[in-house]
Amino acid sequence: MSAVSQIQRLTVSKLRARKGGDPIVCLTAYTAPIAHLIDSLVDVILVGDSAAMVVHGHETTLPISLDLMIAHAQAVVRASSKALVVLDLPFGSYEAGLEFAFAASARALKEGGAGAIKLEGGRRMADTIAFLTARGVPVMAHIGLLPQAIQTAGGYKTSGRTREEWAPLIDDAKAVTEAGAFAVVLEGMAEPLAAEITKLIRIPTIGIGASPACDGQILVTEDLLGLSVSGRVPSFVKRYADLNKIVGDAVASYAADVKARRFPAAEHTYALKQT
């Protein structure tokens, strides 16, 4: 990554300044082709730990390693030049202590080439966020539904559906803001609560299954493209294409051409040179 392309990327400070302004467009990418396709159209590319499910076929995000996340980030950074690339710290890479979290974050920035990291948790992670930001690590926070905590939560459960649940989540949002996070993802959260948090804090909120009032939105790219193993997506996803069908039809056509010996045709082969 050259110094020129680094300067061209959206910076954390410019993203923070978008609070209350034009909506921030975010998507995930784990590979060079997807990163290349979306780079000019989005503000943030999240190299999400959802790669464990989307790319590697796991049932949850938990199995993916930091080494593998860094490899995905390297591919995304090489194929992009405009968007801010944020690397999701995977489960087990940052929770054990402040120095542990810094070591993982340093690898994400130095080896992965990411411009920032994301970690899950509100008040319980505030000290970690403060420790990291004081040492030059830009942090995107993540509250609400926490995919890395599904074992203790008992599954993927939305939050803030009753007024009694609001206060702890508002406290989480305020805590990560005061700790120095430059933005916070609000996932799987009742719409009125997400809208209220967006009004209450001074950093951008990025919604996923939250509210149109958030300062930005994020989805898993393969979900909106209709490209998945199961074909199922969360109810908050709007599907903009059906690549499962498009790819399936293309491969079926290829297979038919091969079986009928229509492929390769003459234009797809190499003739002898004329002497």
Protein language model annotation of sequence segments:
Residues S2-S235, A241-T275:
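Alpha/beta enzyme core
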